[in-house]
Amino acid sequence: MFKINSPLKVIVGFNKKKQKNVEFLLNLNNFRNTFYRVLNNAKVQYKIDIQGQLEGVEKLKRCVMIYTVFKGDNRRFDIGNIASIHQKFFEDAFVEYGYLPDDKYTNIPMVLYRFGGISKDNPRVEIEVFNLDDEYEVKRFKDLTKDTIDTFYKERKRKK
């Protein structure tokens, strides 16, 4: 298992008039409404941003991934709105760098999105990758997902 810290936004250009960087927020709303060239710049920059974190990672044949969103503020949001774009960009980069043969369902049969909390100092999406060909990692994944579900139900009962 390894973990990647993915930024919630990437720099896609520079505004000369305002003398500041142009940022692209990695979420589905922006993805849907943005010009394709800007999207391509965002995807390229994302790959560059995570490349250093992938050094030393073993090549995999099959894996499962957990995307945990840590927001920088208390505003409510849709987890899938943020995590889906991180999933798209990360899995494409993971395949392009040669760590996985393909990102189809036979190589990544399960993906889990979850909320990690508020992190004002370090908003991010943590991506955990578990090798399905390693029994120890499969057990860790099972334990982690069981703990996540147990925590959800305990909180739900407490609120009733």
Regions found by a protein language model. Name each.
Residues 1-160:
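Catalytic phosphate/metal-binding cores of nucleic-acid and nucleotide-processing enzymes, i.e., regions
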